[in-house]
Design a protein with these regions (language model features):
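Short hydrophobic beta-strand element within catalytic cores of glycosyltransferases
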Residues: 269, 293-296
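N-terminal strand-loop element at the rim of the active site
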Residues: 5-6, 12-19, 26-27, 31-79, ...
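Nucleotide-activated donor-binding/catalytic signature segment of Leloir-type glycosyltransferases, i.e.
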Residues: 237-261
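Conserved donor-binding/catalytic core segment of Leloir-type glycosyltransferases
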Residues: 186-205, 211-215, 227
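Glycosyltransferase donor-sugar binding loop
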Residues: 46-48, 197, 225-238, 253
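A conserved mid-protein helix/loop that constitutes part of the nucleotide-sugar donor-binding site
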Residues: 24, 28, 201-216, 236, ...
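Conserved acidic donor-binding segment of nucleotide-sugar-dependent glycosyltransferases
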Residues: 308-309, 313-320, 329-335
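Carbohydrate-associated surface elements
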Residues: 155, 174
Length: 392
């Protein structure tokens, strides 16, 4: 990259302390841009400010609310709005990059509070939601303030079009592909091992589908084992497993980025049995880069990311028998599995930050044309109307 050095404000709507795809995307983008010489400040809800990186400014502590089949930790309201305005005022930014600006969050508050070049990235892929339609009259003029819009996938783009009747350029989430290509094979994790990473207590991550498929898989692949990593309480999950199969499971809990790279380089198959609510599937891109053969449910986001089956195998979503059938085929046919993994590893390079960040920066350049930077908006009627303070 040979770029003009910018002052960039990134807004992350979700709690910085909680693992998640959006948080990882914002963190990696911020650190990539900083390494390229740009000034970057991230505004996010933060619980433990002492552990946050120097480039992160806390907008306050998030609260947990149900959203899109999971629990999102967000921040909203007049106190947060004041902090957003202060951050914008202090930042003297050339450009703001707001993530998920269409949900009640500090990203939406920043869009209300600012004038000037603003890029919005839309991550969510969700069914039509009454809550978004209810505040549509407020959202639409705010979203129109965005100079440019990015969607991380066709699924996210479709959600944006359906909810707010606007469009976006598709630029995928980024990964550091080299980190996963350089993973080391851990002998005890290798062999006929199926890997799963995710919040396994969260139903939409689909671990119960894999658990239901395992007895079938074990009949045809007697040496199969399952390696599970991620946050959650494993006791209840273990109790739901057939006692005769429990010895085949190992629960690792949270793992580091290095351990994740080794995990993905070691397992024979990485399985993503998610049942919905996904817009991209960053873990699939990481698994491809790590050299695992990927087997995923055929939800739209995964089907698209895997090239409709060219770079990873697919099974019918929420169908344990189909999952078992495809997994058995891959476990018993090593040549087929290795060929699939090889295609996936080569394909994963398109998600590397060197590619993705270049595409994002090109959007920044477009948004900056004719601009003199970001300023505070003096027009807050939408905010006052939302709070029932019209005329105040």
């Amino acid at each position: 990259m040979n770029q003009k050095k910018l002052r960039i404000g990134l807004v992350c709507p979700y709690g910085w302390d909680t693992p998640g795809g959006v948080q990882s995307h914002v963190r990696d983008l911020a650190e990539y841009l900083i390494a390229k010489g740009h000034y970057v400040s991230v505004l996010a809800p933060v619980v433990d400010e002492e552990k946050a990186p120097e480039y992160v400014t806390s907008a306050g502590k998030p609260i947990a609310i149900p959203y899109n089949g999971a629990v999102a930790r967000l921040l909203f309201g007049p106190i947060a709005f004041a902090r957003v305005r202060q951050w914008i005022s202090n930042g003297k930014f050339d450009l703001l990059h707001l993530h998920e600006p269409a949900i009640p969050s500090i990203s939406l508050l920043a869009c209300w509070a600012a004038e000037g070049p603003m890029v919005g990235t839309f991550h969510a892929a969700a069914k039509r939601q009454k809550a978004i339609f209810a505040i549509g009259p407020i959202l639409e003029p705010v979203i129109e303030k965005l100079t440019a819009r990015i969607a991380v996938s066709e699924a996210a783009r479709s959600t944006l079009t359906e909810h707010l009747e606007t469009d976006a350029v598709v630029i995928p989430n980024g990964i550091y592909a080299d980190r996963y290509r350089d993973g080391e094979v851990v002998e005890k994790w290798s062999g006929n091992t199926i890997g799963f990473i995710g919040r396994y207590e969260e139903p939409r991550k689909g671990l119960p589908v894999l658990l239901e498929a395992l007895p079938i898989i074990a009949r045809f692949a007697p040496d199969v084992s399952v390696l599970v990593a991620g946050p959650g309480e494993s006791k209840e999950v273990i109790e739901s497993i057939d006692p005769q199969l429990r010895s085949r499971f190992e629960f690792l809990g949270r793992i580091s980025e290095k351990e994740k790279a080794d995990f993905l380089s070691s397992v024979a198959i990485y399985v993503a049995p998610n049942t919905g609510g996904e817009s991209f599937g960053i873990i699939l891109a990481e698994a491809l880069a790590g050299g695992a053969a990927v087997l995923a449910s055929d939800i739209p986001a995964f089907d698209s990311l895997l090239g409709h089956g060219e770079f990873g195998a697919l099974f019918k979503s929420e169908d344990p028998q189909d999952l078992a059938h495809v997994a058995i085929d891959l476990l018993r046919d090593g040549d087929k599995r290795r060929a699939l993994a090889k295609r996936g590893k080569e394909y994963a390079q398109r998600f590397d930050w060197d590619v993705v960040a270049e595409d994002i920066y090109s959007i920044y350049e477009m948004a900056l044309v004719g601009s003199s930077g970001v300023t505070l908006s003096s027009e807050n009627r939408a905010w006052n109307r939302f709070l029932g303070r019209e005329g105040s």
